Amino acid sequence: MGSPLQQLSDAGVAVWLDDISRQRLRSGNLAELIAQRNVVGVTSNPTIFAKALAEGDAYDGQLRDLAVRGVSVEEAVRLITAYDIRWAADVLRPVYEATDGVDGRVSLEVDPRLARDTERTVAEARALWWLVDRPNLMIKIPATVEGLPAITAALAEGISVNVTLIFSLERYRAVMDAFLAGLEQAQQAGRDLSTIHSVASFFVSRVDTEVDKRLSKIATEEAVALRGKTALANARLAYAAYEEVFSSARWTALAQAGARPQRPLWASTGVKDPELPDTLYVTELVAPGTVNTMPQATLDAVADHGTITGDTVRGHYDAARAHLDAVESVGVSMSDVVETLEDEGVDKFVKSWEELLDRVAQQLAAHT
């Protein structure tokens, strides 16, 4: 039977950890999670790095060296985060090799202040790719309107991409189109398509948080009964779209040339509502060929009491469509919800990035 996390892996879900810190790397904890908890990848974001630098003294030595060298705050942030990502990539390298490059992946985000700037996002992606210099790196690029052509351009250059901040089915389809366009351009340039990997990070819990807030405000019996179900419906229909696109003639031509599919990745899987089961966005989103990146608390919850019952996505498409229709019918505009979430998502990461810059600036000054 195996542990819940083993069962999840057996069902075709890659378990990734949504966290990184110098302390976790130095203590050997990441290696332990790989060995004991079926973890086969790591994601990071500005919020995670800001938290890591706020805790303990694991970064003091590097900060001291950077202060002596007189590097700028932005360059220091880039070097500190790249150091952790490179270390994590090396810890995960055996997984990368054992899975022929599918897993063993570590994701590093471009400066979120560039989310509405295509050209600078591509330049930043290129710079981070060169700086980290590991084949199992993925560069995180947001799925903003301006991010879409940046995704295509990065993939065309052979850079593996984790597309982040996807909330809507419409935008997810645009992301898959950007992915296919990038591979087509890479193929025209003579690149080996089998070395270019991508995941599409579809955010889950934030959808319920925003929709449920609006349903509670409407407060009718019908509206209240719809709470806690929209994120799953949205994600399940995203998987239906994935199945459709990756069975198309356009994709088949790329696959025959060695391309790997862009896997759906369930992100924001920590449950925010205490009335919902703390494993909800893992156990109810089991489908082959997906990734679920979990914060430590969610990983621990699934390991402790997660019940894996096989595929919980396919076979639920009609119910998912009916649910989203019902949400609209009681007065919640999903298009407004996802627009709000994208703006909030970018703003949240920008704020965390600025906190990270401030913290590093203070610590560099302390070591000067």
UniProtKB/Swiss-Prot annotation:
CDD domains: Transaldolase_like. Belongs to the transaldolase family. Type 2 subfamily. Transaldolase is important for the balance of metabolites in the pentose-phosphate pathway. It comes from Thermobifida fusca (strain YX). Pathway: Carbohydrate degradation; pentose phosphate pathway; D-glyceraldehyde 3-phosphate and beta-D-fructose 6-phosphate from D-ribose 5-phosphate and D-xylulose 5-phosphate (non-oxidative stage): step 2/3. It catalyses: D-sedoheptulose 7-phosphate + D-glyceraldehyde 3-phosphate = D-erythrose 4-phosphate + beta-D-fructose 6-phosphate. HAMAP family: Transaldolase_2. GO terms for molecular function: transaldolase activity. The active site is at K140 (schiff-base intermediate with substrate). NCBIfam families: PRK03343.1 (NF002881), tal_mycobact (TIGR00876). Keywords: Cytoplasm, Pentose shunt, Schiff base, Transferase. It is an enzyme of class 2 (transferase). Its EC number is 2.2.1.2. This is Transaldolase. It is found in: Cytoplasm.
